[in-house]
């Protein structure tokens, strides 16, 4: 049985294999993205059929090609057809043989409340936030020759409880791109910027 950890502040639960028990290897020794996506979708279809067709499966970018202990898949629900970033997802880590080594439930019960209509930021607002470094990104190492290859409007869910003890969804813009790492490999990245006007 895998050890379990619980974060009382967020309500997140994780089952995990201790790092020292994992066998490291080259990324090429692990199942391909397509193989793991099929595995995850089949399990969703079997155990959570209502989520199988409305979830996006995203692969965490591997920082290195060697000395890799696991490959992680994020299963992210959608709201009105838009991806939800932040802490509202499930992460599944696999070893070289395709066995699950960690399962992290990264969401807490959502207290349903009211909704409101908000204005979205325009290109000028977004550029100002980028210039002010008012964004978050999943870039694990310094990259050069970066280019933006895609754009999407999505949602972000707060990482912690707010003053009322529940969560809220906010619109965000997701800029996808790629750049060159120090070893010459091309790495993908995402930049998340608030899409609220003002």
What is each residue range found by the language model?
Residues 1-53, 58, 77-81:
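Preferential activation on post-signal-peptide N-terminal prodomains/segments
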Residues 1-9, 52-97, 152-188:
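Exposed beta-strand-loop-beta-strand "reactive/processing" segments of non-cytosolic proteins
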Residues 9, 14, 35-38, 45, ...:
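Residue-identity detector for glutamine
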Residues 15-30, 92, 96-120, 188-198:
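A short, surface-exposed interaction/processing loop segment used at functional sites
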Residues 45, 63-66, 147:
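N-terminal start-of-chain detector that recognizes signal peptides
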Residues 48-49, 55-57, 86-170:
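Charged, low-complexity helical/coil segments in non-catalytic cytosolic or luminal regions
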